[in-house]
Amino acid sequence: MNPTETKFNQDMRNIYVTAKEDLGYTASRFMQLVSQKGGLQAARQLILKEGGTYGFEVLWENKRLDLSVEALVLQPEYESLFSDEERMLCRNRLEEFGYF
């Protein structure tokens, strides 16, 4: 794992911690997926999921899409980890839900 992937993996774990602390939302399946597949593969699986995820819905309802995997994927420091198509999916989903 290169340094960028390592940092991304840690930031994925931080999503779980922050959502739990700030919202009282325990995203057990999310953390299980990150632990099993690593942050990068977990993110790819989640962003490609048709119809989005329950966790995204919880974050949207609480006006915290800044904690979404989609928002993390779009951070400039992680551009090299994802394809243009993956990043476009994230941007489109966030735009659809009023993040931008």
Predicted regions: what they are:
Residues K63-F100:
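Amphipathic alpha-helical binding modules
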Residues M1, N9, L23, K49, ...:
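Short linear sequence motifs
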Residues T6, Q10, S28, L40-Q41, ...:
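Generic alpha-helical secondary structure signal
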Residues M1-D22, E96:
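Charged, compositionally biased N-terminal leader segments and the immediate start
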Residues N2-P3, V58-E61, C90:
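Non-catalytic interaction surface on structured domains
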Residues M1, N14-T18, R29-F30, A43-Q45, ...:
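Charged, low-complexity surface segments at secondary-structure and domain boundaries
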Residues Y16-R64:
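Amphipathic alpha-helical packing elements
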Residues D11-R13, Y25, G51-Y54, L67, ...:
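Accessory DNA-engaging acidic/polar modules
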